[in-house]
Amino acid sequence: MKNRLNVLAFFALLFAALYISRGFLQSWMVGTLSVVFTLSVIFIGIIIFFENRHPTKTLTWLLVLAAFPVVGFFFYLMFGQNHRKSKRFSKKAIEDERAFQKIEGQRQLNEEQLKKMGGHQQLLFRLAHKLGKNPISFSSETKVLTDGKETYAHILQALKMAEHHIHLEYYIVRHDDLGNQIKDILISKAKEGVHVRFLYDGVGSWKLSKSYVEELRDAGVEMVSFSPVKLPFLTHTINYRNHRKIIVIDGVVGFVGGLNIGDEYLGKDAYFGYWRDTHLYVRGEAVRTLQLIFLQDWHYQTGETILNQTYLSPSLSMTKGDGGVQMIASGPDTRWEVNKKLFFSMITSAKKSIWIASPYFIPDDDILSALKIAALSGIDVRILVPNRPDKRIVFHASRSYFPELLEAGVKVYEYNRGFMHSKIIIVDHEIASIGTSNMDMRSFHLNFEVNAYLYRTSSVTKLVSDYVYDLEHSNQINFSLFKNRPFFHRLIESTSRLLSPLL
């Protein structure tokens, strides 16, 4: 009791002393904090300058710090630092490589099949194997799914057929009609003894209700939030999001592509209307790679290691294929910016055509130059984007690239049937990529992404026909009219582009 009184007396005296000297302390603290804060801003400015980033990104951050020193200081601490080589991501990369080594025999390149490809196509898939560690599969069946209704008709049916396990990994999960349909099936399968693991992003799914998660957990579904954000304790991980959309069922059937879980992806949102997206159904050997990507992400977040033959056995996933399929993961845990380098390789190796669809088109200088050079060389370069904003700054930043692309001969189209959310690139009508990666800096440098690269499959032919159909529901941008757009539009676009390195 005596000790408690002494403690209370001490704090009472301390409070009294602070109250009496409040004027002096206030001026002293304000002055000290101002000096410390100014030195911190200068220190961060020096760090940015000597990081040897791209000059545009360096200049943008320095301008933000100069114009908004207080906000810019905290904004840089949260979003500006490059943590690709941080201890946490480096550890994941090492563990992923160990996981790859466990199935090394299953991951060797099929040299006989590669010899049937053209020289530049061989180089692309060797590069993908070098960067992404996964070989091309010629024992996989694929099917292109062209919108939410078709995609979820297949997904819901496949989930109902699950017998052993269901693995889901999503950026956005909504507690709405579609979300409830998924939930009810997962609960039913869990009660049947099917092992269900569900990994959802902590930022993309921040609106997901606690009741939704708890109902699934109570039924035995393992629900895990990827890098959850715990206010007010924000960390740099808020900037590195899991943008992947993966489903693996029994190690035999898989899905990957651009669609999240929500009613808007079925065209039920009044603003967006019809939601044009592209997803891929996969059956066969390539599913094992999707499985491995999921299990690595699961281990990263939970610490649970489940890399065994129960989930990765080759006997689970062999089927007859009609071409090559290669699943490639990209993210801050990889040494290289994998998808960016593969997109660049696809563009620079094109002989006849480059067709791109992306809802968020903010290319870096390398991709932008490659597209312009291709068009100037006589290659048919087409870019399909939305005609309405999903994210306004990104939408206006995208349009700022149109004049120089149009001048080089690139054909730019805006989709007018609804909202264009497909993330595809088709080269020479032979090679294509479908996945989660946008043609923007966030997908190239920050997000965890996954893409399927296809070679001479029936799915590539379907992508070509779908693209032609989409162009029939699009408006081609006229260069003469576009370059004479109002000054205010150009101002907004230029400002948005200036901020694009921060997006």
Curated annotation (Swiss-Prot):
* Substrates-to-products reaction catalysed: 2 a 1,2-diacyl-sn-glycero-3-phospho-(1'-sn-glycerol) = a cardiolipin + glycerol
Task: Give the molecular function GO annotations.
Answer: cardiolipin synthase activity
Q: Which CDD domains match?
A: PLDc_CLS_1, PLDc_CLS_2
SMART domains (alphabetical):
PLDc
The kind of enzyme this is, by top-level EC class, is: transferase
Annotated active site residues, numbered on this chain, are 243, 245, 250, 421, 423, 428
Name the Enzyme Commission number(s) assigned to this protein.
2.7.8.-
HAMAP family under this entry?
A: Cardiolipin_synth_Cls (MF_01916)
Q: State the function annotated in the UniProt record.
A: Catalyzes the reversible phosphatidyl group transfer from one phosphatidylglycerol molecule to another to form cardiolipin (CL) (diphosphatidylglycerol) and glycerol.
For this entry, the protein name equals Cardiolipin synthase
Species source reads: Alkalihalophilus pseudofirmus (strain ATCC BAA-2126 / JCM 17055 / OF4) (Bacillus pseudofirmus)
Q: What is the lineage of its organism?
A: Bacteria, Bacillati, Bacillota, Bacilli, Bacillales
Gene from which the chain derives: cls
